[in-house]
């Protein structure tokens, strides 16, 4: 799962990794019918706690069949859906092999990109500089806590390094994920 504030480089990382025949990028496509995700639009709707004790399959989360992906040589799937952050604990418990990658980018660059983006809906924070910085800081604070709780499942990737040396970032991910990504 690729995490980070809007405009932090999550999609850029997925595009780089998507060059590999061993990686399936699901981008922001999560199954809306999966009971594992709490609905941010209905915060009082609880996550199905029974799923927290069970292992999940790829098809429980995405529109993909784990057996078909495996037979096609896929070893890594990625997701950059921003709502996944609301269910990190559930994901970490129900997917023992899940990894969480945080895209780190200069906060002022992120803020400038957010401020100049005209969003179609929501993202009301994007039109006030103070709110933008609160939003960016919240992601960083969240990531710092997550790294403390599950350090073996977390990795921080620097956006600027990704742009300059994508193959080095791929090598870093190969070590972290214990797999050969084989970028083309």
Regions found by a protein language model. Name each.
Residues 1-61:
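PAPS-dependent sulfotransferase catalytic core
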Residues 68-69:
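Conserved motor-coupling elements within RecA-like helicase/translocase cores
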Residues 62-63, 139:
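Hydrophobic residues within well-ordered alpha-helices
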Residues 23, 30-32, 37-44, 72-184:
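PAPS-dependent sulfotransferase catalytic domain
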């Amino acid at each position: 799962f690729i995490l980070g504030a809007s405009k932090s480089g999550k999609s850029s990382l997925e595009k780089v990794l998507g060059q590999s025949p061993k990686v399936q990028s699901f981008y922001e496509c999560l199954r809306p019918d999966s009971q594992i995700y709490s609905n941010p639009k209905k915060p009082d709707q609880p996550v199905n706690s029974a799923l927290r004790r069970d292992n999940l399959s790829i098809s429980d989360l995405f529109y993909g069949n784990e057996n078909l992906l495996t037979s096609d040589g896929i070893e890594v799937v990625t997701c950059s859906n921003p709502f996944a952050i609301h269910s990190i604990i559930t994901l970490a418990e129900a997917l023992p092999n899940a990894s969480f990658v945080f895209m780190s980018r200069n906060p002022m660059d992120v803020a400038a990109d957010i401020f100049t983006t005209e969003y179609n809906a929501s993202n009301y924070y994007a039109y006030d500089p103070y709110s933008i910085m609160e939003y960016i800081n919240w992601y960083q604070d969240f990531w710092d806590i997550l790294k403390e709780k599950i350090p073996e499942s977390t990795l921080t990737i620097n956006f600027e390094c990704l742009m300059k040396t994508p193959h080095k970032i791929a090598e870093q991910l190969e070590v972290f994920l214990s797999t050969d990504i084989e970028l083309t």
